[in-house]
């Protein structure tokens, strides 16, 4: 089985690439969807978030208010508190998923789509976890693919996705800038990657790059 990490900054188009790879035959798991599942009531991550951040992050229906939690993390200076809770559980779940894929199909191309493949190791080191195998991307993946795009284009894409009707796009763009500050720049990610896809044109061009990538992964 080939273990592939697919990453890129907010608004880069990595989710689109993940969709193309799934169509081509890859097994794909999305870190965002996995993170949402881990934050559901009854999950250990949910309980720890409520313990650390307090009941104000819980809506009347018992679910986490993800916007309030994100504001505390990104604007309130508590991103490391959140990452300390979520990242280890998310990576462990990704590893379990890969093990399940291998049992089903030892020849599979298993793709983890995550914005923070490099950042989780950086953040672990900031917490003093110098030798953690769990977060070492070199050991987690056989290949790493980075999707890049100009920052202005990333921000515009994010704002359009968050506010498709147009209202609130300025606030969404400001939010994107805050989030991007916490992500490793494209140039640094690209220097570490095995493959780089440049998402500066239309989806047809990005799909063509993805097809070429798929052929290399399967070679």
Pin down the residues of each PLM region.
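Glycine-rich phosphate-binding loop of ATP-dependent small-molecule kinases
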Residues: 1-64, 104, 215-219
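Phosphate-binding beta-loop-alpha motif at adenosine-nucleotide cofactor sites
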Residues: 29-30, 193-205
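N-terminal polybasic phosphate/anion-binding patch
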Residues: 31-40, 55, 150, 160, ...
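ATP-dependent small-molecule kinase phosphotransfer cores
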Residues: 36-110
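An amphipathic alpha-helix signature
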Residues: 46-50, 151-159, 173, 177
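ATP-dependent NMP and nucleoside kinases share a basic, alpha-helical "lid"
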Residues: 95-104, 110-160
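C-terminal accessory "lid"/substrate-recognition subdomains
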Residues: 102-105, 177, 181, 185-191, ...
């Amino acid at each position: 089985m080939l273990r592939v990490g697919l990453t890129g900054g907010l608004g880069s188009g990595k989710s689109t690439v993940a969709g193309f790879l799934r169509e081509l035959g890859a097994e794909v798991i999305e870190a965002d969807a996995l993170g949402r599942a881990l934050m559901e009531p009854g999950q250990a991550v949910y309980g720890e978030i409520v313990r650390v951040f307090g009941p104000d992050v819980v809506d009347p229906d018992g679910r986490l208010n993800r916007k309030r939690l994100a504001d505390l993390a990104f604007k309130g200076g508590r991103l490391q508190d959140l990452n300390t809770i979520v990242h280890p559980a998310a990576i462990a779940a990704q590893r379990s998923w890969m093990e399940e894929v291998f049992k089903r199909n030892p020849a599979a191309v298993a793709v983890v789509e995550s914005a923070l493949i490099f950042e989780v190791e950086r953040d672990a080191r900031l917490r003093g976890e110098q030798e953690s195998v769990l977060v070492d991307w070199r050991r987690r993946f056989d290949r790493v693919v980075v999707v890049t795009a100009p920052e202005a284009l990333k921000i515009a894409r994010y704002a359009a996705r968050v506010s498709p009707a147009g209202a609130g796009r300025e606030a969404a763009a400001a939010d994107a800038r805050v989030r991007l500050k916490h992500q490793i720049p494209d140039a640094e990610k690209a220097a570490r990657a095995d493959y780089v896809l440049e998402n500066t044109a239309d989806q047809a061009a990005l799909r063509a790059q993805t097809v070429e990538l798929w052929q290399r992964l399967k070679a």
